Amino acid sequence: GADGAAQVLRAKHIVLATGARARQLPQLPGDGKTVWTYREALTPPALPKRLLIVGAGAIGIEFASFYRAVGAEVTVVEMAPRIPPLEDEDISAQVAASLKQDGIQVHTQVALEQATRAGDAWQLTLRQQGGPQGTLQLQADVVLVAAGIVGNVEDLGLDKTRVQVEKTHIVTDAQCRTAEPGVYAIGDVAGPPWLAHKASHEGVMCVEHIAGLHPHAL
């Protein structure tokens, strides 16, 4: 409660919708000033001259396109062989070509090895994966970490239930049910795709299932 006292709530059905947060990289602890997550990227105090984005999923590519359109020099680095990494190869090829046509530098199959702040700039060392081995040196004024998100599964007491957690996300079936009867999980905490309309549909589907209806699964 508001006074700090513990409360015990009981329910026949429980829906977990605790969301997720940006994944942090040990080499780039977020400070909100020169190392951003998607939250800081939405409300920047000023336009960075050089922006480097780590991760080429939906979030990384969206911000790359936006910041390039408003005048920033943008570089995108990704560990996977192509971007976006989870799309079909022909779609990835079109996206990569479009980004390069807009003047966005794209580096795939590279892993962040080291990051140091020197004066007003970040110096990043990336290890090339596959093909010719070596390192790549890049500089940026601001680094946006878009390397995925982590489900908010802590402090929920899940260890006392049959709810399963894999890769920081709650495991559910097609009706958003967990392994614990009566406990559901929806939205970002239930894993990808991390999209608002997916979470909204899951919420409706989950409640309809609880009400005894037979909603269509995703």
Where are these regions (language model features)?
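Feature captures the FAD/FMN-dependent oxidoreductase FAD-binding
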Residues: 1-13, 106, 113-123, 152
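Core beta-strand elements of the Rossmann-like FAD/NAD(P) dinucleotide-binding domain
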Residues: 4-13, 132-142, 179-180
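Helical element adjacent to the flavin cofactor pocket in flavoenzyme catalytic cores
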Residues: 5-8, 18-22, 95-106
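Hydrophobic/aromatic beta-strand patches that form the interior of the parallel beta-sheet core
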Residues: 15, 36, 75-77, 107, ...
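Glycine-rich dinucleotide-binding loop and its adjacent helix/turn
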Residues: 18-73, 77, 102, 159-161, ...
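Short glycine-/small-residue-rich Rossmann-like dinucleotide-binding loops
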Residues: 19-20, 128-130, 144, 148-149
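FAD-site-proximal beta/loop scaffold in flavoenzymes
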Residues: 31-47, 137-138, 142-214
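Rossmann-like dinucleotide-binding cores of NAD(P)H-dependent redox enzymes
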Residues: 42-43, 48-52, 58-128, 133-136, ...
